[in-house]
Regions:
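Short, surface-exposed basic-aromatic patches at helix termini and helix-loop junctions that form
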Residues: 10, 126-134, 154-160
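Residues at the C-termini of beta-strands that transition into short coil/loop
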Residues: 59, 140, 172
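Short glycine-/polar-rich loops that comprise or flank the Walker A/P-loop
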Residues: 50-51, 107-108, 132-135, 161-167
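Conserved interdomain linker/interface between the two RecA-like ATPase lobes of SF2 helicase motors
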Residues: 149-175
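Short, solvent-exposed coil/turn elements at secondary-structure transition points
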Residues: 34-36, 142, 174
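Conserved helicase ATPase motor motifs in RecA-like P-loop NTPase domains
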Residues: 115-119, 130-147, 162
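SF2 helicase/translocase NTPase motor core
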Residues: 1-113, 117-128, 150
Length: 175
């Protein structure tokens, strides 16, 4: 789902991307974890006044690359210095001033979280808070009872879009 979400959001011909581009005057940047770690698309001139969508899974920040998100990042020095000068910098506990998590927090990104049902740990929730998002869209096959569900997609629709890796067997229980 993560790869397909990225592919669709990055495709200028996809209806969702077309709507986002229309609503934000084509000033939209779609980023994933790897883009952020190398600073791709993250500089003062490109982020000024644009909508930034950062697509990740909670697992993105739990491995070695996750720790790198809190470390000094020379690729982001210009952006974080710009954020400080503009009064947009956000301090993130345990993170370097030039870290990816700090740069993203200062941008107040819209965050699309794949497999959000894994976000039960305090560490996962802290990571999400550290991103300082303006909006979070959670994607999950198993929403909690308290979830604010805005859309449902059937298993057949997911299979038709090749978003399910395993065969899906759906049946109705009578009685």
């Amino acid at each position: 789902i993560l790869r397909q979400t990225l592919r669709q959001l990055r495709n200028p011909a996809h209806p969702l991307r077309m709507a986002i581009d229309r609503d934000f005057s084509h000033r939209v940047e779609i980023l994933d974890k790897e883009d952020g770690l190398v600073g791709r698309g993250l500089n003062a001139s490109s982020v000024e006044g644009q909508l930034t969508l950062f697509v990740l899974s909670y697992d993105s920040f739990k491995n070695k690359d996750g720790r790198r998100a809190y470390a000094e990042n020379s690729s982001l020095v210009a952006l974080t210095n710009y954020q400080k000068a503009q009064g947009e910098a956000v301090e993130v506990a345990g993170a370097d001033d030039t870290a990816l998590i700090t740069a993203l927090a200062g941008m107040h990104p819209i965050v699309v979280v794949d497999e959000s049902h894994h976000a039960k740990s305090s560490l996962s929730l802290e990571m999400l808070r550290n991103l300082n998002p303006r909006f979070v869209l959670e994607l999950t096959a198993t929403p909690s009872v308290k979830s604010n569900i805005i859309s449902r997609v059937s298993a057949q629709e997911l299979k038709a879009e090749e978003m399910v890796k395993l065969p899906v067997i759906v049946y109705r229980r009578d009685g």
